[in-house]
Amino acid sequence: MPTTQKTLMFLSGFLTSLGSVVVICSILATQAWITSRIFFTDAISNGTIVITYGLFRGTSAQELNEGLQDLDKNFEVLGILDNSSQKSLHLVVILLLILSLAASVLSSVFTFYNSISNPYQTFLGPMGVYTWNGLSASFVFLAMVLFVGNAESNHLSDKLSQKLYPDTTNKRTTHTYGYSFWLTLHVIFLNIVTAVIIIFYQKARYRQKQEQRKPVEYAPRDGILF
């Protein structure tokens, strides 16, 4: 059976891993990843299109300086994108977050298993915990970078705007990233905290082993028998 110290520390790691699972699920479910303001003109009006969307769903509205305003629209991100580079990169972002979710789930399983067992010298021990947390953080970071690249350089918001309002001409676009996007940093933070907890446990375990292996010369001697 594991010691009380090990149980408590790995349960702490389990809670932080479980926290990252919950955060990733929130990231996938919410649609406040980005809000884009697209300044446009068409034959009879001009103004701003405001698009807010996440990985799967979004909303759009017009703020006109003059002309007849369209009704607000709800849309499916993947549903209105054709087979384009924007859609391909968006799918990669979703895939990376799903992989990060799977890695965080495995980290939760490994930390909980270590809190009730002693698979220390195998991959099921701390090495497995480090691996899954490292992969989870890496996948999330790549998803962040690709999403920003798709929005800024690959003009994802402009593509969505053209599909929603085909008769408009886009002039300029600005982006504001929402809480769903910034939650990805919390996932990386929780992955780091989980790894740090296990590092502290390993250091404490190493110190205990060193104390148990004190040289014989420090032990009391009553005498030497010949």
UniProtKB/Swiss-Prot annotation:
One of the GO biological process terms? sensory perception of sound
Reading the lineage from the top rank, the first entry is Eukaryota
Record bears the keyword Thylakoid: no
Q: Does the keyword DNA repair apply?
A: no
InterPro entries, sorted: Clarin (IPR026748)
Q: How does it sit in the membrane?
A: Multi-pass membrane protein
Q: Which keywords label this protein?
A: Glycoprotein, Membrane, Transmembrane, Transmembrane helix
- Compartment(s) of residence: Membrane
Recorded coiled-coil stretches: none
Mind telling me which residue stretches traverse the membrane in this protein?
8-28, 92-112, 128-148, 181-201
Give GO cellular component annotations, separated by semicolons.
membrane
Q: Which residues are glycosylated?
A: N46
Indicate the family of this protein.
Belongs to the clarin family.
Q: What is this protein called?
A: Clarin-3
Question: What gene does this protein come from?
Answer: Clrn3
